[in-house]
Swiss-Prot record:
Origin organism lineage: Archaea, Methanobacteriati, Methanobacteriota, Methanomada group, Methanococci
Residues covered by the HTH cro/C1-type domain: 128-183
DNA-binding region: 139-158
Protein name in the entry: Putative HTH-type transcriptional regulatory protein MmarC6_0210
Pfam family, one: HTH_3
Domain of life the protein comes from: Archaea
Source organism (scientific name): Methanococcus maripaludis (strain C6 / ATCC BAA-1332)
UniProt cross-references to InterPro entries, sorted A to Z: Arc_TR_HTH, Cro/C1-type_HTH, Lambda_DNA-bd_dom_sf
GO molecular function, one term: DNA-binding transcription factor activity
SMART domains reported for this sequence: HTH_XRE
Record keywords: DNA-binding, Transcription, Transcription regulation
């Protein structure tokens, strides 16, 4: 079922003129999709409650650094089948069905969101109040018709609470005015977590006994990069040049860190290189010792990395390697 859903999402994104990465296995996301300035990090799950805390944290952190929208596409929750046209949320990440995603890409955003107690909608509180006062309808009258308290009506008008879909429809019909607002899932998510500090990254890697990764991340941090260490992605770290604030000129390096090189490492590095090209960024494979030069992969030994002065020098090094491979 998951593979079918993944295939359907790939077809939909191609039809919608997105550029798409190759699918990843055992990652916090399955696809990266890009169209103009819009970027999606997509996780496909049959059961959206199977997303782990660790996966969600990493997905959110990568999304923040890449200025992308993280989204889960699934078919059910732990207890029931997901409703079409409804937005669910897991660990701060929006979760929807394939059909809801398709409608959103077609310009038809969902209007209902799932929360404790049922399904709710966002309404325009200012329009509600203006219309009620214009029609000379009291708060008490509207509360009686809607079967909620006067206090609740006041909260709706102040946008301090949202009604259930059933209550919202009653109010709209009584006032004869549209109040329900769509939920734009492609809006950049507020409150995305910041990337981990170097100390947090070290603590996690230390537990896994990966001293070589610590050395590499330490060197990159000393150069001046913002760093995000990952364990649930096809790359081991994302390094962002601290000085760059203009997102159009964002210098990001997707970094794979391995002591030894083998066919699996090269395959993984080539996938990451494709991601970097898609996102107009860079990729780098750092090894204990370099073996054979691969024309498709920009790689360097840790001793070479230690000789690099700062972020500018490393980016220049990568650019030169890229150009030499194109010749």
């Amino acid at each position: 079922m998951r593979e079918v859903l993944l295939s359907e999402c790939i077809d939909l994104l191609y039809e919608s003129h997105f550029v798409i990465s190759k699918p990843f296995g055992r990652s916090c996301f399955d696809l990266i999709a890009k169209k103009a300035d819009l970027r999606f990090l997509i996780k496909i799950l049959k059961n959206i409650d199977s997303l782990s805390t660790e996966q969600s944290e990493e997905l959110l952190n990568i999304a923040k650094m890449l200025q992308a929208v993280p989204i889960i596409i699934g078919t059910r929750t732990r207890n029931s089948v997901m409703e079409e046209g409804a937005v669910y949320e897991r660990y701060g990440i929006k979760a929807i069905t394939f059909n809801t995603f398709r409608d959103q890409l077609s310009g038809e955003p969902p209007v209902v969101y799932a929360n404790r107690g049922g399904f709710f909608v966002n309404i325009d509180g200012a329009v509600l109040r203006e219309t009620r006062e214009k029609l000379k309808i009291s708060v008490g009258e509207l509360a009686e018709i809607s079967r909620v308290s006067r206090k609740t009506i006041y909260k709706y008008e102040q946008n301090e609470a949202n009604p259930s879909a059933e209550v919202a429809i009653k109010i709209e019909e009584y006032l004869d005015v549209p109040l329900i607002k769509g939920i734009n899932i492609v809006d950049y998510m507020e409150g995305l977590k910041s990337q981990k500090s170097r100390e947090e990254a070290f603590e996690k890697i230390l537990k896994e006994g990966e001293d070589f990764k610590i050395r590499v991340i330490d060197i990159l941090g000393d150069m001046g990069f913002n760093l995000l260490e990952t364990t649930k992605a096809p790359f081991d770290a994302v390094a962002e040049e601290s000085k760059i604030e203009d997102s159009e000129n964002q210098n990001i390096i997707f970094t794979n860190i391995q002591e030894t090189e083998n066919e699996e490492i090269r395959r993984k590095a080539m996938i990451v290189d494709e991601i970097s090209k898609m996102l107009n960024s860079h990729s780098l494979l750092v090894l204990e010792k370099k073996t054979n030069e691969n024309k498709r992969i920009t790689s360097m030994s840790i001793s070479e990395l230690e000789k690099i002065g700062d972020t500018v020098d490393l980016l220049e090094f990568i650019e030169k390697r890229k150009k030499s491979k194109e010749i």
